[in-house]
A protein has these predicted regions:
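Residues that cap or initiate secondary-structure elements
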Residues: 25-28, 43, 121, 130
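Short, catalytically relevant binding-site loops at active-site mouths
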Residues: 1-2, 41-45, 79-81
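Active-site-proximal beta-strand elements of phosphoester/diester hydrolases
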Residues: 1-4, 36-38, 93-100
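A short C-terminal boundary segment appended to hydrolase-like catalytic domains
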Residues: 117-161
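Divalent metal-coordination and catalytic microenvironments
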Residues: 22, 37-40, 77, 115
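Binuclear metal-dependent hydrolase catalytic cores centered on His/Asp/Glu-rich metal-binding motifs
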Residues: 1-32, 54-59
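Short acidic, glycine-rich surface-loop motifs adjacent to enzyme active sites
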Residues: 30-46
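Conserved beta-sheet core of the metallophosphoesterase superfamily
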Residues: 47-125
Length: 161
């Protein structure tokens, strides 16, 4: 963890050199690959989350990842599930937060996310502890970026309906 000149150091700080190295690797992924980045803190403010973001250099990192085509930025820290677009320019990555397996209640039951995808969309299902087992709590369907294959599938689906 880097040094921060603020009293609440739990808000996090982003190292832009690490960000650029990760973005370079992700930008060179095969065409059509689902690009997922995992980090502890949500990079930008997620409306509806129980805690504020305020990650130092988080907005800049989000823009870098968005520009290199990252589909999902998977995070924790706030301990509640969410899936929200991070729209910058004409592209959108999604910020996807997971719960925690801790039994200490934080506004959502203990839980985790299940992620499934195809060429058109990513489906994120938040599973929560019911007291005896994990069960689906909420599901988000997130459209993938427009790759040529995804565009063709969307066009074919709209013609047939």
């Amino acid at each position: 963890r880097g040094w921060q000149m603020r009293t609440n150091w739990s808000k996090g700080v982003i190292d832009l050199d690490q960000t650029r190295r990760a973005a370079y690797a992700l930008a060179n992924a095969p065409q059509g690959a689902l690009k997922i980045l995992a980090c502890h803190h949500p990079l930008v403010e997620m409306i509806g989350a129980p805690m504020s973001g305020e990650v130092i250099r988080g907005e800049r990192a989000a823009r870098i990842f968005n520009d290199c085509g990252v589909d999902l930025i998977m995070t924790g820290h706030v301990h509640v599930p969410f899936a929200l677009p991070i729209t910058m320019g004409d592209r959108a990555s999604y910020g996807v937060g997971a719960g925690t397996l801790s039994m200490r209640e934080r506004g959502a039951p203990a839980g985790f996310n299940c992620v499934e995808w195809d060429d058109v969309a990513v489906t994120v299902t938040a599973l929560g502890w019911s007291g005896s087992h994990f069960e689906p709590q909420r599901t988000w369907r997130l459209e993938r970026r427009q790759t040529p294959k995804a565009a063709a599938l969307r066009a074919a689906a709209s013609i047939s309906s």
